[in-house]
Amino acid sequence: MKPLLSVIALSFLTSLPAQTPLISKPAPKRWPAQITKVGIPCSDGATQEAMWFAPASTEKKPLLVGLHTWSSSYASAGGDAVYAEWCVAQGWAFVHPDFRGPNWTAPALGSDRAVQDVVEAVAWAKQQTQVDETRIYLIGVSGGGHMAMLMAGRHPEIWAGVSAWCGIDDIAQWHAEHTKNGVPDKYAQNIEAALGHAPTKGDPEAWKRSPLSCLKQAAAVPLDIAHGIHDGRAGSVPFTHALRAFNAVAAEAGRLDANAFRLFYDTQKLPPGWLPAPPDASYGVKVPIFRHISGNTRLTLFEGGHEIVHQAALNWLAKQRRGQPVVWDVRDFIPLDVEGESGK
């Protein structure tokens, strides 16, 4: 029998109906005892530190790659500890790579080197334990959501499913949103430190590090993009980033009317002709407001801010298999009682 989570109540439907919305509890701030710190050799000669777990089983198992947030590193637990708790309980392998740390240095912030660090973390994990290559998953919120979308576009061949929450789609655009009257705030300053300059629209270095530059290559990847509708007001990333990201990967016939994005953000009301999302109990109290699907890509805007709903994210990923049709129905989800960790 797989071990139960200490902070995540995992049970099957016999003990708790999946349709029951759950009351949120604070996310854990420490890694589970089973998680260890490791050093992963990098192709540039450096050593990438990471948090790691693999069950003792010699059978092939899913691998979850958890991506740290904008200002965090491999060692930062917070809501990312929920990813680890899930893996311990479900018998998955887990790696939480550093990919050059917080996003205020040139090697970080979605650089080629940071992208390669994630690729090499996956390769290293496969050397340590038997990994089911049809079940390699990627998850992140905020800066981790940015990197998740970037990895979906840069290396679509790896992932069985990518869950990206409140991610930045365009670095130059986000810099502009965090510059008021010519004065950059801390996030804009981080970007300037990483790039070596203040980017303007069309800046090639900022564009290369932006998911919009490559998301069209992620069309074959099951990609779940989610964003709280209060983000940008009670949070640092306006949900218009999710709308643009969705359109970047969606087929032309499935794209949303980009002319309505600003109206939606300003009013927080659905534009004419946009239908309310159907119920999705996996979101608990963070009720979906709008949902749209095109091919393997789904957009969900929910009642929330700059945060991830772990229950929805992890249960959706668990349904996906590389090479098989995407699965959107998660009505038989495993309930979690830890939700709502924001990304920083």
Residue ranges of model-derived segments:
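N-terminal cap/lid segment of alpha/beta-hydrolase-fold proteins
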Residues: 20-58
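Short substrate-entry loop that stabilizes the transition state in hydrolases
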Residues: 59-61, 67-107, 171, 233-235
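Mobile cap/lid helix-loop segments that gate and shape the active-site cleft of serine hydrolases
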Residues: 71-76, 160-161, 167-168, 172-216, ...
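Alpha/beta-hydrolase active-site loop
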Residues: 109-129
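Primarily recognizes the serine-hydrolase "nucleophile elbow" in alpha/beta-hydrolase
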Residues: 124-128, 133-183
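Active-site-adjacent alpha-helix of alpha/beta-hydrolase-fold enzymes
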Residues: 196, 229-295
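Short beta-strand/loop motif that positions the catalytic acidic residue
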Residues: 225-227
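Catalytic active-site module of serine/aspartate enzymes centered on a nucleophile-bearing elbow/loop
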Residues: 291-343
